[in-house]
Amino acid sequence: MLVLGIESSCDETGLALYDTQRGLLAHALHSQIAMHREYGGVVPELASRDHIRRALPLLEEVMAQSGTRRDDIDAIAFTQGPGLAGALLVGASIANALALAWNKPTVGIHHLEGHLLSPLLVDQPPPFPFVALLVSGGHTQLMRVTDVGVYETLGETLDDAAGEAFDKTAKLIGLGYPGGPEVSKLAETGTPGAVVLPRPMLHSGDLDFSFSGLKTAVLTQMKKFEAAKLEGEALERAKADLARGFVDAAVDVLVAKSLAALKKTKLKRLVVAGGVGANRQLRAALSAAAAKRGFDVHYPDLALCTDNGAMIALAGALRLGRWPEQANADYAFTVKPRWDLASLAR
C-alpha cells in the first residue's frame, strides 16, 4: 500500500510518500520559522496562507523524488487534528481535493499518533508494546502503547508543555525565535550546577508533569540579574548558566518520569517523539539511563522529530492496513483542533 501523507497542523508544511513494502520513499518539508520570527511566534492566519502556497510544490517534489505517478497512490492521509483550525483545514481540503480528482480514499490522522509512531520509520523499529514520551511545543505525555490505536495515558502536563516552557524561557532570557533550540544551544555553554532550579513534581508519586513553576523560577533569576545590574560579559555568562540550569531541571524531570513509567508498566522499551525529542541533553540523559538500567530507548531520525508528512503517511498506512473501513471515499471531512489522543484507543 502506497500512502501520500499531508501535515499542516501548525507552522510546517510536510508531504511524504510511504509504502508498506518499501518504506519511506520521499518526504519534503517547508518550515515557516523565518516568516514568523519577526512576530516572536506563530501567526495562525499567515500559517494557513503559507500552507496553501507550499503544499502543491512539495507534492510535485515528492512525486518526482520517488518517481511516483498518481495512479500508484492507494490512499491519502492528512492531519485531522489537533492543531490550528485554519492550518488543519488547508491540509484537509487539499487532501480531499486530490482524493476526489484522483479517485482515492482518505484517512484523517491524529497529529500526536503520527509523532508517537514516527520512530517506526527507522531501519530497526521498536516492537510493541512500549512506553512513549511525547514531548513537543504543545504536548507532554507519557503513553503506554500496546499496538497501533491501543493507547493508555499514563501521565501528562497539568499546565505548560515542555516545549512551551523551553520557548518561554528563551523569551525571558532574550533569545530569538524559535526559542527551544536557542535555549538548548546556549545551555551547552553554561556551567553545570551554577544555577539550580526546582524540579517540579519530581517526587509527586504520579506520572504527571508541571513546567509553569520552572518558567517562573527563570523569571525570578532574571530579575535577580537585573537587580545585581549585571551587564556585558557577566550578564551573558549568567544567562548561559541559567539556560543550563533550566535545561538540566527539565531533562531531570522528563527522565525521572519516563523511568517511573517503565517501572510501573514493567516494560523495557521507551520511545521518544516530538520536537523536544531532538534535544541533545535529553537524548544523552535517556541513553545513559538506558545503559545503566537495562532498557532500550528509541528515537526518530532528527529530521523527523519536527512536524512532517512522513509520520502522517506512516500512520495512515498502518491504520488502513488494520482497519480498511476507516477509508473515507465520500470526501466529507472535519478537523479537530482539540483532540485527545487517548480517545483513539480501541
UniProtKB/Swiss-Prot annotation:
Subcellular location: Cytoplasm
Gene: tsaD
Name of the protein this chain belongs to: tRNA N6-adenosine threonylcarbamoyltransferase
Binding-site residues for Fe cation, renumbered to this chain: 111, 115, 307
Cofactor note: Binds 1 Fe(2+) ion per subunit.
Record carries keyword tRNA processing: yes
Role played: Required for the formation of a threonylcarbamoyl group on adenosine at position 37 (t(6)A37) in tRNAs that read codons beginning with adenine. Is involved in the transfer of the threonylcarbamoyl moiety of threonylcarbamoyl-AMP (TC-AMP) to the N6 group of A37, together with TsaE and TsaB. TsaD likely plays a direct catalytic role in this reaction.
Organism for this UniProt entry: Burkholderia lata (strain ATCC 17760 / DSM 23089 / LMG 22485 / NCIMB 9086 / R18194 / 383)
Biological process annotations from GO: tRNA threonylcarbamoyladenosine modification
GO cellular component terms given for this protein: cytoplasm
